[in-house]
A protein has these predicted regions:
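A contiguous loop/helix-start segment that scaffolds small-molecule binding in enzyme catalytic cores
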Residues: 46-138
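Class I SAM-dependent methyltransferase SAM-binding "motif I" and its flanking Rossmann-like core
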Residues: 1-47
Length: 138
């Protein structure tokens, strides 16, 4: 949908992963030095933000998602954190999957993939990734 960011469109495919506070981080170091991206990932983990990740991998940087997962784990995210991936958001052959942060470390993704990392309250509810807002227990 024009004007709607991939983070929100892909989030709707997965369920409701980006409720409450969240951030969007690109892993592309073409315009942003990797050291700054590392700091953003660490701060997002320490703040227990839900995170949408753009540009998770490319031919020139095939291991950036794995590096990002390690940074998140080192800074407070649990291996059991609920995560999601959506490929080809809003296009033909759209695919989605809900996994854990531990499983994400070994996933092969590309530039057509948006990755979602939950927070401590994010759950897999009937194959939907849901981050409750805290008004009522789900």
């Amino acid at each position: 949908i024009p004007g709607l960011t991939a983070a929100l469109s892909g989030g709707a495919v997965l369920g409701a992963p980006l409720a409450h506070d969240f951030c969007v981080i690109s892993l592309s170091d073409r315009l942003t030095p990797w050291e700054i991206i590392e700091k953003r990932l660490a701060c997002a983990a320490m703040g227990d933000f839900c995170v949408a990740i753009y540009n998770p991998s490319s031919k020139g940087r095939p291991d950036y998602l794995q590096r990002a997962v390690r940074i998140l784990l080192q800074n407070g995210k649990s291996e059991e954190t609920v995560c999601g991936i959506v490929r080809n958001i809003g296009r033909e052959r759209q695919q989605s999957e809900i996994i854990t942060l531990r499983e994400l470390e070994n996933k092969q993704v590309d530039m057509f993939t948006t990755v979602y990392i939950g927070n401590k309250t994010t759950k897999n509810i009937e194959s939907k990734m849901v981050t409750p807002r805290g008004y009522r227990t789900v």
